[in-house]
Amino acid sequence: MTNPFFEPWTAPFEAPPFDKIKPDHFAPAYDRALKEHLAEIHAIANDPAAPTFENTIVALEDTGRLLNKVESVFHNLASSHTNEHIEAIELHMAPVMAKHWTGIHMNGPLFARIDSLKQNEGKLGLDAESLRVLDRYWLDFVRAGAKVQGAGKERLAHIVERLATLGTEFGQNVLADEQAYVLPLAEADLAGVPDFAKEAAAETAKDRKLDAPFAVTTSRSSVEPILAFADNRDLREKLFKAWTARGDNPNDHNNAALIQEMVRLRAERAKLLGYKTFAHFKLADKMAKSPEAARKLLEDVWAPARRRALEERDALQKVVTGTGGNFKLEAWDWRYYAEKLRKERYDLDESEVMPYFQLEKMIEAAFDTAHRLFGLDFAERKDVPVYHPDVRVWEVSRKGRHVGLFYGDYFARSSKRGGAWMSSF
């Protein structure tokens, strides 16, 4: 069996050949890529020449080309169009990749070269960008355990591997609950729901091969229109609770035990690295620098934010009472009555605004903004392989010169994790 990862990519612009890549290709591709990467790392770590920015940092930047290619394609598929084969590979590879990178970060000779450069950075004559790269490499190695000694190093490596597995299981559990949940609905259930949301619900029922004319899932794009527009309060409550319970249901996908173990291991990892808590470790290289600084910001914001939230709650409760409701405002009521209040105060109905935000118009607006700000032009390409029929590809250019490809994947589906996010190849 030929493996696309071992052959030149002949699609336009050497784009990933998604039409040829199969799940069975990843295991041998990972195996070869990891071996090649370790050989490259070994050569740098054991270079007899004194460490320089070029033979250490620049050399590291140039390693792992095949691994980067395999990883970028795989993780895009795992997030965008997964299946049981991809999930099995993801779960298997999570600790393997954690062990691989931990081994690199704890490579004594390699870190000694990086540390030597860091200690002498003022004598290297580097520009600001190169100094930043050196600093980031050094910090990443230290935060990954390069300075941990003795038994602590072995324990830290084990923790990192285990956390990788737990994190993967956590995400897969949430997606599994999202894939499993579907709520069939009749026309009467959708009173108040605008046509655009009804059309999406009808498409969901068709995709799930249901007898019911409509259906909703716990994907955000399915939930939010129901919470904002459905007159049926019982439906809003049922869907809201299902949405917020993903990964917390009494089934095989419950994340409670995973969370407890993750919290314990994160705390232990932080202490092995010399930090008081995981929060101190996590924030040390962020703008806040410490949990104390982050907490101060939250406390400064808390009082006015809470005051405003209570004002909004009281205003919404008045709408509930004024429209004949004899109940206390709950979480599944908030969007619905906020929509009514918006219409009452500003004569603004979101369902009437939605047609002005059609996908094609939003794509056109985004591309126009990119052109005005950065001089970028976008031309759709139909000859570039994609991983799902929903995906569209545009060639990006500036003043006639090729810049890259932009893949747009705009629709929710059961094989795709929720949210707004991006990846790169």
Regions found by a protein language model. Name each.
Residues 1-200, 215:
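N-terminal helix-rich structural modules
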Residues 10-25, 74-93, 115-158, 215-257, ...:
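Short His/Asp/Glu-rich catalytic/ion-coordination signatures at enzyme active sites or charged loops
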Residues 2, 94, 236, 325-327, ...:
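Intrinsically disordered, low-complexity regions enriched in Ser/Pro/Gly/Gln/His and often acidic
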